[in-house]
């Protein structure tokens, strides 16, 4: 039980450092960019599969 308490403490300290250190804003901006990149890749993949006449695998 002490092991899990220490693990939770370490995770909380790391989250606090990242949250109050300004890295969170940078990571959020990076995540937004990645979201739109992968959204475009999804649309391209769907269009290519539709043009080839292949349906989605079930």
From Swiss-Prot:
Membrane-topology descriptor: Multi-pass membrane protein
Name of this chain's protein: UPF0391 membrane protein Maqu_2901
Tree of life domain: Bacteria
InterPro entries registered for this protein in UniProt: DUF1328
Transmembrane segments: 4-24, 28-48
Alphabetical keyword list: Cell membrane, Membrane, Transmembrane, Transmembrane helix
Family: Belongs to the UPF0391 family.
One cellular-component annotation, GO: plasma membrane
Pfam families in the cross-refs: DUF1328 (PF07043)
Main localisation: membrane
SS bonds (residue pairs): none
Localization per record: Cell membrane
């Amino acid at each position: 039980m002490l092991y899990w308490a220490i693990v939770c403490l370490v995770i909380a300290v790391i989250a606090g450092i990242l949250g109050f250190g300004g890295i969170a804003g940078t990571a959020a901006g990076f995540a937004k960019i990645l979201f739109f990149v992968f959204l475009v890749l999804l649309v391209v993949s769907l269009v290519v599969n539709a043009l080839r006449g292949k349906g989605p695998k079930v």
